Design a protein with these regions (language model features):
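PRPP-associated nucleotide enzymes
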Residues: 1-206
Length: 206
């Protein structure tokens, strides 16, 4: 929903990037922040985005917002929520720890995540910050309905297989699983498909 639909005013942030790569940020409505709840919406789509989130949210608390609400529609690195080999860095956990270290607003800090790849990610947050896991299932249901009659609900991510199976069961749809093999950090190969989707509309859920 847009800020106007939920009775929030959209704040403005001045951002300048210097030739050496350093960033300058300024909250242009700083005077309006004090004693008001602040909502920051962003995804952890890159390391730069994570640091930007941390810097701006820190500034919101320093300007004395009454409560801080971080909304993360897409939690990047969510497939790196545990180490499968010795020496691997669990980046999802480190992001959670970083956000947990934010200064705390008077009425607390909250982080909202949507359909996490692994539900365990929310338990990496520490201290007083409160993680809240949400689902976009109602929106996804509507999007599937708009596709047309009797589509196939599929996933190429085996971490989503159970979710897709449950959703397709509730909607009375067929499901499909695309088995893939990762060849490198940038290349994957499809090795199997467990359903016949020829001539049918397919909704792929990641």
């Amino acid at each position: 929903a847009a800020p106007s639909e939920i009775d929030f005013r959209l704040g403005k942030i001045e951002h300048t990037r210097f030739p050496d790569g350093e960033n300058y940020y300024r909250l242009l409505e700083a005077r309006e922040i004090r004693n008001s709840p602040a909502v920051y919406v962003a995804g952890t789509v890159s390391d730069a985005a994570v640091m930007e989130m941390y810097n701006i949210c820190s500034a919101l608390v320093m300007e004395q917002c009454s409560s801080l609400h971080i909304v993360i529609p897409y939690f990047g690195y969510s497939t790196m929520e545990r180490a499968s080999r010795r020496g691997e860095v669990v980046i999802a956990k480190n992001i959670a720890r970083l956000l947990s270290s934010l200064p705390t607003s008077a009425r607390g800090n909250f982080v909202y995540m949507v359909d996490l790849h692994s539900l365990g990610t929310q338990y990496y947050f520490e201290g007083s910050i409160r993680p809240i896991h949400l689902t976009a299932e109602p929106l996804i249901r509507q999007m599937i309905a708009d596709v047309g009659e009797n589509p196939v609900l599929a996933t190429a991510d085996m971490g989503r297989a159970k979710w897709v199976q449950k959703m397709s069961g509730r909607l009375g749809l067929d499901s499909a699983y695309i088995m893939k093999q990762r060849l490198s950090g940038e290349q994957t190969e499809v090795v199997a498909l467990n359903a016949n989707v020829s001539g049918r509309r397919v909704v792929i859920y990641y």
